[in-house]
């Protein structure tokens, strides 16, 4: 046998030799051993690299901000993976107070929003300007996300936006007929809620817009679901008063 062919045995032999010598000393003998027994079942722990821990030693965890980043990058697969792994960061907020779900709603990321809702994301959590995923979806015409929230979560109707409005008022004012229908059919929203200016959804649909067909349709939906035509805003005006002042004859005919 060539001399170098047994060099690889030396570390192992030394380990077991040391173990054997230690064992003999612990038994009160000083007998040295000239033989080495290799135990095929013995194992010597290998050093671990702290920069590359094994999955068994350190389970993967979600670092703060990682889910927010995944949503912002529209990385559907990573959002799914992180949400499946842990919901601890499902409602984390960035420097603007935006949650992962609110970011998804902002950009109408329908599939990502559904994943987050399925994993318990809070649809009522507000950012620093008092937008919540539910309120924003209602106000900005994110109809598919709004529908999913209504089916799979519980909107808190006591939470209002920075103008004091609920989801219905801006939906009506911005001409989002599908959202108006959805919210009215769901039935949980207060159809006669008044914001800081005393505006209802009905008043805003008349007073703040152009009286076009889409607003005629919205007014029709509101009236069909029992909107109170007699309510007055902070200036003491009704929706009918505004329709008359602005010359919106089609709306006026609906309101009188």
Residue ranges and their predicted role:
Residues 17-18:
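C-terminal motif of bacterial Sec signal peptides marking the signal peptidase cleavage site
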Residues 69-74, 103-109, 136-142, 170-176, ...:
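Ankyrin repeat A-helix N-terminal signature
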Residues 78, 111-112, 144-145, 178-179, ...:
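Conserved ankyrin/ankyrin-like repeat signature
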Residues 223, 228-256:
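Leucine-rich solenoid repeat scaffolds
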